[in-house]
Amino acid sequence: GKEKDALKTYEKVLTLDGDNLQANIFLGSYFYLQAEKEKKKLDDDFKKITSPTRMQYARYRNGLSDVLTNSYSKAKTYLQRVLQVFPSMEAGNTLERIKKIEAEIR
């Protein structure tokens, strides 16, 4: 439950101060980790299928596309804000990983 409270609190902070470093770092990291978890589940579930049909493959690709659109894109937005305010190597590395994932999925 506290995770959702923290999420709401940081989102409120950003409505008052869009460049707040802590809030952008937290939200960027949160959405990135959520995306990684969702992607791993999709990958694991798909790997369990020995010979996937076209429909199963299409469902898998659509799932990846949803994760990209919903979670990775949100993470990217917050992490880009971090870099505008503070030269964070970690945020930069995470953005690079997101770019690679975008290239794989598209």
Please provide the spans of the model-predicted regions.
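Canonical tetratricopeptide repeat
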Residues: 26, 94-97
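Structural signature of tandem alpha-helical TPR/SEL1-like repeats
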Residues: 1-9, 71-77
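Short coil/turn linking the two alpha-helices of tandem helical-hairpin repeats
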Residues: 1, 28, 33-43, 99, ...
